[in-house]
From Swiss-Prot:
Molecular function as annotated in GO: aspartic-type endopeptidase activity
Disulfide bridge partners, by residue number: none
Assembly and interaction partners: Binds ubiquitin and polyubiquitinated proteins.
Keywords from the named record: Aspartyl protease, Cytoplasm, Hydrolase, Protease, Protein transport, Transport
UniProt keyword annotation of Hydrolase present: yes
Gene Ontology biological process terms from the UniProt entry: protein transport; proteolysis
PROSITE patterns assigned: UBA (PS50030), UBIQUITIN_2 (PS50053)
Domain Ubiquitin-like: 1-57
Lineage of origin: Eukaryota, Fungi, Dikarya, Ascomycota, Pezizomycotina
Protein name listed in UniProt: DNA damage-inducible protein 1
PANTHER family: ASPARTYL PROTEASE DDI-RELATED (PTHR12917), AT13091P (PTHR12917:SF1)
Source organism: Aspergillus terreus (strain NIH 2624 / FGSC A1156)
Function recorded in the entry: Probable aspartic protease. May be involved in the regulation of exocytosis. Acts as a linker between the 19S proteasome and polyubiquitinated proteins via UBA domain interactions with ubiquitin for their subsequent degradation. Required for S-phase checkpoint control.
Pfam families: Asp_protease (PF09668), Ddi2_HDD (PF24669), UBA (PF00627), ubiquitin (PF00240)
InterPro entries (UniProt xref): DDI1_N, Peptidase_aspartic_DDI1-type, Peptidase_aspartic_dom_sf, UBA, UBA-like_sf, Ubiquitin-like_dom, Ubiquitin-like_domsf
Amino acid sequence: MTVDLLKAIVESETSIPPNAQRILYNNQLLGDDTRTLEQVGIGEGDMLGVQVMLRTPQQPARALGGSSAAAAQQNLQRRQAMGPDPETIRLHILGDPRVREAVRRQNPELSNAADDPQRFREVLIAQQRREAQLEAEKEARIAMLNADPFNPENQREIEEIIRQNAVTENLHNAMEHHPESFGRVTMLYIPVEVNGHRLNAFVDSGAQVTIMSPECATACNIMRLVDQRYGGIAKGVGTANILGRVHSAQIKIGSLFLPCSFTVMEGKHIDLLLGLDMLRRHQACIDLKRGALIIQDQAVPFLGEADIPKHLQDEFEDEPMVKGSDGAEVGARTGAVTHQANQGGASSAGPSSAPAPSSNAPRINIRPAPTQSSRWPQDSIAKITELGFTREEAMRALDAANGDLDGAIGFLI
């Protein structure tokens, strides 16, 4: 059997023409098609590689913008044909305060326009047009990747799309199985007295020393005891001035009077922070199950969220937010997610359908995992589909809203 005949057999199996095939044996190109396999040294059980040479003319690439615009227009028309009438959506929002609140959180621009029918229609169509354009661009990009899958740059993009699909699936699983991880955790405070002055102390086992602000030290009348020889600069996430150290002062925790040392530091919004030095010295135990600080067999309950003074929470409420490309907002200090990610944009990283390449080119299907059967009531799914949405969109929205029908409709709108 000659190399040329081998290429013909490959063509019959893969529809790849012989002139686009490059046969490799031991990473060596078989350039002479007239030689037999025996002459080349190929025996039974040997493995051969076929490298496909694809011709990618520049004209289709330049026309990508036009085709993307046409696809976007088709997507928009399909959305408008399948989706509910804008006036129906507007009346549904106005008729249910819970739906309007959900829309206000997820889509403030659309919520603000709900009182004006013409403005609402314009905003809704503009948002649908943007989504259709993004979807068309992604589909066009997927088509280009499918056209030349062996290109190293394309391989990296394919890997990134697969990674993004995994991230999206992980997000959906987290929101479905443990949505509490997206909330904000109340910090641990206990009521104490320092030198007869009552205040709330922040319990932080991650701090090396017990820290007090200069204002609190003045209020407790211990600023006069600050040893400035222990001053300096604290470096961590930023810097802060250390004014000095109070070597010993009395602190009351529960009914216990304990000696404690304080490092007086500027730049802290918290009056008193109980660090690891004080906690270990008195063998304190943070018991989260009981919600208390156990110290010398005495339980001191942590303050509830409603009992924590407002000024102690300002640092966390006014914390800088890190915005992601998909709309998520994460607290820079606490890590709390205060605005859920745009699931539609994240999940569209891997479109479920892409334009098919020519039959003589290998195809790489980049798809998210198929949607599983929903665990939510069929009545809820039916009510959403009656508004013009597909069953898959209804199930995804119910998963994101943890089964809440109004919240799911708010996500879709």
